[in-house]
C-alpha cells in the first residue's frame, strides 16, 4: 500500500475520522521495513567486524572464519543440498554467486568462505546433495582463485609495471 501525502491532504486527513485508519497500516508497514533494515545493517556490521578480526589475526583465525561460513553453508545446503547429477555451469554458477552475494561482495572473501564450506562438507559425502555442492564449489573456485590472484598481483605489483616493452 502506497500513500502519498502533501500538506493539504494531511490537513484534511487529520480532520477526518479516517486519518487513524488510513495512517495506521502505513505506519506499521514503515515500522516493519525500518526494523528489517536495522536488523540487516547490524548483521552486515557484525560480519564486517568479524572479517576485520579475521584479517587482523596472524595466522588467520579459523574459528572466526567458521562463524562467518556457517550461515553461508546453511544457505548453500538449503539451496543446493538436494540436487543430484552433474553441475550445469551456465545455470548453477550464477545461482551460487547470487547466494554468496547476499553475504559478501568481495571475491577474496568468497574464496575463503567457499574453501571453509568445502572443508566442512568433504567428510560427510554420504548425504544426497553434497557431491553436487562440492562439485559446484570446485567449479566456482576454479574461476575465483585465478581471478583473485590476478587482482592481488595487480594491486601489489602495479608499481613494477614494465613500460619499455
UniProtKB/Swiss-Prot annotation:
Keywords from UniProt, A to Z, are:
Plasmid, Secreted, Virulence
Phenotype reported upon loss of the gene: Mutants lacking this gene are defective for virulence in a mouse model of septicemic plague.
Subcellular location field: Secreted
Query: What is one cellular component GO term in this UniProt entry?
Result: type III protein secretion system complex
| SUPFAM superfamilies in UniProt | Type III secretion system domain
- InterPro entries named among the record's database cross-references: T3SS_YopR, YopR_core
List GO BP terms, alphabetically: protein secretion by the type III secretion system
Instruction: Tell me the superkingdom of the source.
Output: Bacteria
What's a Pfam family in this record? T3SS_needle_reg
Q: What does this protein do?
A: May be involved in the regulation of the assembly of the type III secretion system (T3SS), also called injectisome, which is used to inject bacterial effector proteins into eukaryotic host cells. May control the secretion and/or polymerization of YscF/SctF, the principal component of the needle filament, thereby impacting the assembly of the T3SS. Involved in pathogenesis.
The free-text domain remark for this protein reads: The core domain is composed of five alpha-helices that display structural similarity with one domain of YopN/SctW, a central regulator of type III secretion in Y.pestis.
What family does this belong to?
Belongs to the YopR family.
The record's NCBIfam families line, in alphabetical order, gives:
type_III_yopR (TIGR02509)
The protein in question is named Type 3 secretion system regulator YopR
- Record the organism: Yersinia pestis
- What gene name does this entry carry? yscH
Amino acid at each position: 500500500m502506497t500513500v502519498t501525502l502533501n500538506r493539504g491532504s494531511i490537513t484534511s486527513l487529520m480532520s477526518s475520522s479516517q486519518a487513524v485508519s488510513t495512517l495506521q497500516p502505513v505506519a506499521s508497514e514503515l515500522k516493519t521495513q525500518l526494523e528489517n533494515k536495522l536488523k540487516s545493517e547490524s548483521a552486515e556490521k557484525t560480519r564486517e567486524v568479524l572479517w576485520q578480526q579475521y584479517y587482523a589475526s596472524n595466522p588467520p583465525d579459523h574459528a572466526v572464519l567458521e562463524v562467518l561460513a556457517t550461515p553461508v553453508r546453511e544457505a548453500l545446503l538449503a539451496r543446493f543440498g538436494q540436487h543430484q547429477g552433474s553441475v550445469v555451469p551456465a545455470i548453477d554458477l550464477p545461482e551460487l554467486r547470487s547466494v554468496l552475494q547476499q553475504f559478501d561482495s568481495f571475491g577474496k572473501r568468497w574464496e575463503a568462505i567457499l574453501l571453509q564450506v568445502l572443508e566442512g562438507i568433504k567428510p560427510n559425502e554420504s548425504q544426497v546433495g553434497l557431491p553436487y555442492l562440492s562439485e559446484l564449489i570446485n567449479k566456482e573456485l576454479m574461476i575465483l582463485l585465478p581471478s583473485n590472484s590476478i587482482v592481488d598481483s595487480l594491486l601489489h605489483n602495479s608499481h613494477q609495471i614494465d613500460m619499455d616493452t
